[in-house]
Amino acid sequence: MAAESLPFAFETVSSWELEAWYEDLQEVLSSDEIGGTYISSPGNEEEESKTFTTLDPASLAWLTEEPGPAEVTSTSQSPRSPDSSQSSMAQEEEEEDQGRTRKRKQSGQCAARAGKQRMKEKEQENERKVAQLAEENERLKLEIERLTREVETTRRALIDRMVSLHQA
């Protein structure tokens, strides 16, 4: 399984959010190991329905478009009776939630792309700075060598002059 970058700048997320996301990820991964389906004992259809209707799809918004638990929430509901207006309302709410989740996924992916772009730009800027500093360092080394030679030449000239004044 390949790691993906986060859809946001790392410093904008609080530790409690990261912890909650980590717990959600653990739940998703454990359900993936089981096969991505929810297995219930016979006669628990009502409890199963509660489980999947209370699952918050927004917590899974950062997942990729790959099939997984987000699809399970939409397909694993108990059968509806045709005269039940509550179940149709619940279905509409769930569809709205899934629509919001898709929008969040898309905006999260856009944010991830923007974050990656900023990281690339920052990396390129840092590389330019390193190159500039290396050039500046080399220039300063050459300047130090030149000044060292000049000081040595001046020192010799001064010593020669003092010796010639002493002899005269």
From Swiss-Prot:
Function as written in the Swiss-Prot or TrEMBL entry: Multifunctional transcription factor in ER stress response. Plays an essential role in the response to a wide variety of cell stresses and induces cell cycle arrest and apoptosis in response to ER stress. Plays a dual role both as an inhibitor of CCAAT/enhancer-binding protein (C/EBP) function and as an activator of other genes. Acts as a dominant-negative regulator of C/EBP-induced transcription: dimerizes with members of the C/EBP family, impairs their association with C/EBP binding sites in the promoter regions, and inhibits the expression of C/EBP regulated genes.
Top-rank taxon: Eukaryota
Biological processes per GO annotation: anterior/posterior axis specification; apoptotic process; artery development; blood vessel maturation; cell redox homeostasis; cellular response to manganese ion; embryonic organ development; endoplasmic reticulum unfolded protein response
Keywords: Activator, Apoptosis, Cell cycle, Cytoplasm, DNA-binding, Growth arrest, Nucleus, Phosphoprotein, Repressor, Stress response, Transcription, Transcription regulation, Ubl conjugation, Unfolded protein response, Wnt signaling pathway
Gene responsible for this protein: Ddit3
Complex and partners: Heterodimer. Interacts with TCF7L2/TCF4, EP300/P300, HDAC1, HDAC5 and HDAC6. Interacts with TRIB3 which blocks its association with EP300/P300. Interacts with FOXO3, CEBPB and ATF4.
Region of interest (Interaction with TRIB3), ranges: 10-18
Residues modified as Phosphoserine: S14, S15, S30, S31, S78, S81
Region (Basic motif): 100-129
Positions of the UniProt region annotated as N-terminal: 10-26
Compartments reported by the entry: Cytoplasm; Nucleus
Annotated region (Disordered), positions in chain: 34-130
Family: Belongs to the bZIP family.
Residue stretches of biased makeup (Low complexity): 73-88
Protein name in UniProt: DNA damage-inducible transcript 3 protein
Ranges where the bZIP domain occurs: 98-161
GO cellular component: CHOP-ATF3 complex; CHOP-ATF4 complex; CHOP-C/EBP complex; cytoplasm; late endosome; nucleoplasm; nucleus; protein-DNA complex
Main location: cytoplasm
Originating species: Rattus norvegicus (Rat)
Entry comment, domain topic: The N-terminal region is necessary for its proteasomal degradation, transcriptional activity and interaction with EP300/P300.
Region (Leucine-zipper): 133-147
Bias kind Basic and acidic residues: ranges: 118-130
GO molecular function: cAMP response element binding protein binding; DNA binding; DNA-binding transcription activator activity, RNA polymerase II-specific; DNA-binding transcription factor activity; identical protein binding; leucine zipper domain binding; protein heterodimerization activity; protein homodimerization activity
